[in-house]
Swiss-Prot record:
This is Acylphosphatase. Its EC number is 3.6.1.7. Pfam families: Acylphosphatase. Keywords: Hydrolase. The active site is at residues 20, 38. The gene is acyP. It is an enzyme of class 3 (hydrolase). It comes from Listeria innocua serovar 6a (strain ATCC BAA-680 / CLIP 11262). Residues 5-93 form the Acylphosphatase-like domain. It catalyses: an acyl phosphate + H2O = a carboxylate + phosphate + H(+). PANTHER family: ACYLPHOSPHATASE. Belongs to the acylphosphatase family. GO terms for molecular function: acylphosphatase activity.
Length: 93
């Protein structure tokens, strides 16, 4: 099956609350490869690659807020965006 890509930019109270750590666990659940990192503006950026169905489930989970302490304001989704092909899902520091 073909793998789809997406870049997500998540705004709100998403840094310092375990968001990247729990996002990594959600990525494992849906067989997502890619990265998650904090941005200087307080948002989080996620690069994701997976089969379409799993990618959509992952995006839905992110919209709900994977970390209990986070408060999501908005999730900007750029499907089909160029993403580095990876075998794992990693937190970028």
């Amino acid at each position: 099956m073909a793998r789809d890509t997406a870049i997500l930019r998540v705004t709100g109270f998403v840094q310092g609350v375990g968001f990247r750590y729990t996002t990594k666990h959600v990525a494992y659940k849906y067989d997502i490869s890619g990265t998650v990192k904090n941005l200087d503006d307080g948002s989080v950026e996620i690069h994701a690659i997976a089969e379409e169905e799993n990618l959509n489930k992952f995006i839905d989970a992110i919209k709900k807020g994977p970390s209990p302490g986070c408060r999501i304001e908005h999730v900007y989704i750029y499907k089909g965006a160029p993403v580095e092909d990876r075998k794992t899902f990693d937190i970028v520091y």
